[in-house]
Design a protein with these regions (language model features):
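Lumenal/periplasmic acceptor-binding loop at the mouth of the active site in multi-pass
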Residues: 1-85
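Membrane-interface catalytic loops of GT-C/OST-like multi-pass glycosylation enzymes that act
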Residues: 72, 94-98, 114-131, 187
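Transmembrane alpha-helical segments
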Residues: 80-87, 137-149
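Membrane-interface helix-loop-helix junctions at transmembrane boundaries of multi-pass membrane enzymes
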Residues: 84-103
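Signature aromatic-anchored transmembrane alpha helix within multi-pass, membrane-resident enzymes
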Residues: 95, 143-179
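Hydrophobic/aromatic-rich transmembrane helices and adjacent perimembrane loops
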Residues: 122-146
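Membrane-proximal, lumen/periplasm-facing interface regions of secretory-pathway glyco-
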Residues: 127, 164-203, 218-219
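Short periplasmic/luminal acceptor-recognition loop of GT-C membrane glycosyltransferases, typified by
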Residues: 209-224
Length: 234
């Protein structure tokens, strides 16, 4: 029983959920899927040196393939902190709707961890499974902007357009750093491998042939080629 609890908290909950959560709102070490918990791959990373060193050790003089990995994205806790501000703001201002968002956050996150009962050594990262939970936290990030606006109104004793404009400008740092850090590893320009594979499949068969492929990953390119590009609809 103790081993099962240890596996649940340390692997299923911490490694396979909270690590993904921190990827999105704190930062990510690399886009390399780790094996056997290798400390140089796939962890969360904030960009704040002393915090990262507590968890990952010294971050100086790293090999080029680690230090310059395009998936190495650091947000300095800014999205997380703005979301936390929004969470507290909604809890104080609107507890009823807070409970709705909180239930969405829990049911699409921690509850799914329990439901799926993730096995060790997954073939790929499973962060996409918990996207609903991350969306819920993004609601709090949005409400965090309102909290900053109210703080500016309280500090300046002025209402009107100045406070929301100032709050928007200040909080644009968050989407700004997300865009700046993620653009290079999320840019899909000139990545045509999936489309090319589907095209090759379809061009290799006789008219009106039946194509038998391997699972969903091979099916999606075929659908795209046929339904969007109009390649070999026969």
């Amino acid at each position: 029983f103790a081993e099962n609890l240890n596996f649940f908290f340390n692997y299923q909950l911490s490694y396979m959920y909270w690590r993904y959560f921190l990827w999105n709102f704190v930062g990510r070490q690399s886009d390399i899927q780790p094996t056997d918990a290798i400390i140089t791959d796939g962890n969360w990373l904030s960009g704040i040196k002393w915090i990262d060193e507590l968890y990952l050790g010294p971050q100086d003089n790293l090999p080029d393939e680690i230090a310059n990995n395009k998936g190495r994205n650091t947000y300095y806790f800014l999205p997380f902190l703005l979301g936390l501000i929004g969470l507290i703001y909604q809890l104080n201002r609107d507890p009823r709707n807070f409970s709705i968002v909180m239930w969405l956050f829990v049911m699409m996150g921690i509850a799914l961890v329990v439901y799926f009962n993730t096995s060790p050594n997954e073939p790929r990262e499973r962060d996409y499974v918990y996207a609903g939970s991350f969306y819920a936290f993004c609601i709090w990030i949005g409400l965090g902007v309102l909290a900053v606006r109210d703080l500016i109104v309280w500090a300046t004793r002025r209402k009107g357009l100045m406070a929301p404009i100032a709050a928007t400008v200040v909080c644009m740092v968050v989407p700004g750093i997300l865009a700046a850090q993620n653009w290079d590893d999320h840019d899909r320009s000139h990545r045509t491998m999936a489309r090319d594979i589907g095209w090759n499949y379809l061009q290799s068969v006789l008219p009106n042939a039946i194509v038998i492929n391997y699972g969903d990953n091979d099916t999606f390119p075929l659908w795209f080629n046929q339904e969007v590009d109009g390649v070999r609809p026969d």
